[in-house]
From Swiss-Prot:
Its EC number is 2.7.11.1. This is G-type lectin S-receptor-like serine/threonine-protein kinase RLK1. It is a single-pass type I membrane protein. Residues 299-349 form the EGF-like domain. It is an enzyme of class 2 (transferase). Residues 531-803 form the Protein kinase domain.
Length: 832
């Protein structure tokens, strides 16, 4: 849920005064003839542009972030921030951005048309028409005219009639139109706030569902003009040159939303709203900034909620307070970090393992010393309490939470009522106020007893022993073995245990692991369990996986998988530590579970749960093909698992080696992602990581070969390849047919031959609509330009049919890389 747009809706007012500077023009007096074009260029942050006659505004491609694509925009060109006031919102990509080399052309039949470097159309202003020319006006409006005179007012399209998140003077909002916020300052996806002139003439400001941003999925209403009288409804929201904003009604009466502004008398101010329609006056001279509430739409306290639905100004577990000019400020509590560091208004995640109520964990959880409270004075979370008590003092209130595994926080009323409210995670509508009469106490794991997963520089300073202990303390969900498990031990293993006990650090780790149902094994124990490593299950880039049998309490045996790292070198050491650290922190039904590990001398092994149905590769590449329904369910489940790694862990995790051989199936054919040996933790305060090339041929994203920053989009690429394998039941690289699957799949899609991908698969042939959707999603995922790939949340939503899937462009328009016969192998390798 929820991120508040850094810029809810911009309302920009300009006083047009004569300018004293003449700027170079790409077009003559704002007139753009048919055939003119602009190209997005990596060589400069702002590509070539067309300027309005005064030079106040520019039109062209803008690159917002170094590693992202471009957006077609209109912006202020005479201020240093180059503030964008319009952007092509309906770009036919999942990210809303277009790649380097894309071109916008003014055409006779489509008006403004964006095409990628291969000529694939990404967006157009008109579905049809006969455009004679375009004109870029001094008030920031780009207008397309029909054949004939401009004076005839035969306007086919204009940016003013298709607003995005900004309203300029002389720009009006018609019935049924709306302004929509951006997700963040640097994200051009639709945000969750909308200012709309409804069909009944009522002007309303809404908060929308953050996931869908749909106008039909309204959470909160902040304002309405009540101009919905059936006899005299509002017909237009007018914004004039005097700074006056009003709803024009049918009988020409005005409902004034904002009076004329006296500040319009100063030299050419720009009004830019941020936060909840709060204005900032930025003169062209940029010497001063003046703020205030715009439109009268602001409440006295925008942090104060009016209903329990949605999460208002700040995300879950985030605290809202009012700063200067009544602007909402959001801040994560101590021991919490932003889910998206670029969005201060978003959700906050705990940096510790939260208490659970699983029966097997109650012994540990019952120790109240494991937890403590952080205190947030004059802070309240008004919704979501599940129990309340009257006449409790503060200590009794906190004690009731410590002994309750459901309780995440308590709110204690400091007024005369002395009331205590218990809350569960996530906490919503957090508000801090100097006049608040409540204190919040959030329950966190006690640092003095157990280290917790951390982010930032502190994590880098922890040595391996401390990391291991903290990981073990974070894995109470892995309950395959009870601390009372008794293992058969040979005399050799007993002696090894005695020797091991002399190592204080190893003893500490073992004790910690046993307390939390995770085991530190000796080499002898695992050698006995695997019958001296005789039954091989599979091989990876750095190790071999063996089948093993461990005796548990009662004399029964449990089957396990033991991964033995077969070479001891720096990379192996790094892989071993990464795998234990990463898997020990996560628990999700589509991720493999860790049981324990061995780190004895030069022997490094990891013990997993055993999944009886083997790998997805064995499941897919067999005859007869698995059922189409099973394959669809597996595709969605794997996407959810990767989404969890990328967005829902306390630290973002990049797997780096997604492929069918690393997907295991349980007895119900539920997929679980395994082999995190190549995983890289991407700390929450970073945007990318540079690393050695890792992965498996056929699944490796192009940026690995270009010494480019590695982001979570490498997993998206690998998933796209695997999704094609799931659809076709063919390997990414087929040596027998000498076929590269991604090339063949795109050719079939481009030529309308999708049935070739599912030949002899009657079940899939009867569901070609889903087949086509999955193939299009896969092609989006394998785009060579990583900025064109969707994130895994978008992928999951597309798989589930929640969001539309547009036709993808050629995924490899620039690629000169070819697989040699020698390299046509799907064996796991480490690419250097």
């Amino acid at each position: 849920m929820g991120s508040l747009s850094c810029s809810i809706i911009h309302l920009v007012l300009i006083l047009q005064l004569q300018t004293f500077f003449v700027f170079s023009q790409n077009i003559r007096n704002g007139s753009v003839p048919v055939g003119e074009s602009l190209t997005a260029s990596e060589s400069q942050q702002i590509s070539s542009s067309w300027r309005s006659p005064s030079g106040d505004f520019a039109f062209g491609f803008r690159k917002i972030q170094p590693n992202d694509g471009f957006t077609l925009s209109i912006w202020f060109d005479k201020i240093s921030d180059k503030t964008i006031v319009w952007h092509a919102q309906a770009v036919n990509t999942t990210t809303g951005l277009v790649p380097n080399g894309s071109k916008v052309t003014l055409t006779a039949d489509g008006g403004l048309v964006i095409a990628d470097p291969r000529g694939q159309e990404l967006w157009r202003a008109l579905s049809g028409g006969s455009v004679s020319r375009g004109r870029f006006t001094d008030d920031g409006n780009f207008v397309l005219f029909r054949d004939g005179s401009e004076d005839s007012d035969e306007v086919l399209w204009s940016s003013f009639e298709n607003p995005t998140d900004t309203l300029l003077p002389n720009q009006n909002i018609e019935v049924g139109r709306n302004l929509s916020s951006r997700r963040t300052e640097t994200s051009f996806k639709k945000g969750r706030f909308s200012l709309r002139l409804e069909d009944d003439g009522n002007l309303q400001l809404h908060s929308l569902n953050a996931e869908t941003a749909s106008e039909s999925d309204i959470y909160s209403q902040y304002y309405e003009s009540n101009t919905n009288d059936p006899n005299n409804p509002g017909i237009q929201l007018v914004f004039n040159q005097s700074g006056e904003i009003y709803v024009l009604q049918r009988n020409n009466s005005r409902f004034v939303v904002k009076d004329r502004d006296p500040d319009f008398s100063i030299a050419a101010p720009f009004y830019i709203s941020t936060g909840f329609l709060l204005s900032t006056i930025i003169p062209k001279e940029a010497r001063r900034i003046v703020g205030g509430c715009l439109l009268g739409l602001c409440r006295d306290n925008m942090c104060s909620p009016d209903d329990a639905l949605g999460n208002m100004a700040c995300g879950y577990n985030n605290i809202c307070s009012l700063g200067n000019n009544k602007r909402p400020k959001c801040e994560c509590p101590e021991r919490f970090v932003l889910k998206d560091p670029s969005n201060e208004y978003g959700d906050c995640l705990p940096d510790f393992e939260m208490q659970t109520c699983r029966p097997e964990n109650q012994t540990a959880n019952s120790d109240v010393n494991l937890y403590e409270f952080i205190t947030l004075e004059k802070t309240n979370w008004p919704f979501g309490d599940y129990e309340s008590y009257a006449n409790y003092d503060e200590e009794r209130c906190k004690a009731s939470c410590l002994s309750d595994c459901l309780c995440a926080a308590v709110i204690f009323g400091t007024n005369r009522d002395l009331k205590c409210w218990k809350k569960k995670f996530p906490l919503s509508h957090g508000e801090r106020s100097p006049r608040g009469d409540s204190d919040t106490f959030i329950k966190v794991r006690n640092r003095s007893i157990a280290d917790v997963p951390v982010t930032g520089n502190r994590a880098k300073k922890l040595d391996w022993l401390i990391i291991a202990c903290s990981v073990l303390l974070g894995t109470s969900a892995f309950v395959i073995f009870d601390t009372s498990c008794s293992y058969r031990k040979t005399k050799k293993s007993k002696n090894m245990m005695k020797n091991q006990a002399r190592d204080i650090g190893r003893t500490t780790a073992t004790t910690t692991a046993n307390e939390l149902n995770l085991r530190v094994f000796t080499y002898g124990e695992l050698a006995e369990a695997t019958r001296d490593f005789t039954e091989e299950l599979g091989r990876g880039a750095f190790g071999i996986v063996y089948k093993g049998y461990l005796e548990v309490a009662g004399g029964s045996e449990v089957t396990v998988a033991v991964k033995k790292l077969d070479r001891l070198d720096l990379d192996n050491e790094k892989e071993f530590k990464n795998e234990v650290k990463v898997i020990g922190q996560i628990h999700h039904k589509n991720l493999v579970r860790l049981i324990g590990f061995c780190n004895e001398g030069q022997s490094q092994m990891i013990v997993y749960e055993f999944l009886p149905q083997g790998t997805l590769a064995n499941f897919l590449f067999r005859r007869p093909r698995p059922s189409w329904e099973d394959r669809k369910n597996i595709a969605v489940a794997i996407a959810r698992g990767i989404l969890y790694l990328h967005e829902e862990c306390s630290e973002q995790i990049i797997h780096c080696d997604i492929k069918p051989q690393n997907i295991l199936l349980d007895e119900y054919y539920t997929p679980r992602i395994s082999d995190f040996g190549l995983a890289k933790l991407l700390l929450m305060n970073q945007t990318y990581t540079l690393t050695n090339i890792r992965g498996t041929k056929g699944y490796v994203a192009p940026e690995w070969f270009r010494n480019s920053p590695i982001t979570s989009k490498v997993d998206v690429y690998s998933y796209g390849v695997m999704l094609l394998e799931i659809v076709c039941c063919k390997k990414a690289v087929d040596l027998e047919d000498n076929v590269i699957l991604i090339n063949w799949a795109y050719d079939c899609f481009r030529q309308g031959r999708l049935e070739d991908l599912t030949e002899d698969d009657s079940e899939a042939m009867n569901d070609m609509e889903t087949v086509e959707r999955y193939v299009k999603i896969a092609i989006w995922c394998i785009q060579e330009e990583h900025g064109m790939r969707p994130n895994m949340r978008n992928v999951t939503q597309m798989l589930e049919g929640v969001i539309q899937v547009f036709d993808p462009p050629n995924p490899s328009p620039y690629s000169t890389f070819t697989w040699s016969d020698e390299s046509l192998s799907s064996d796991p390798v480490s690419l250097v």
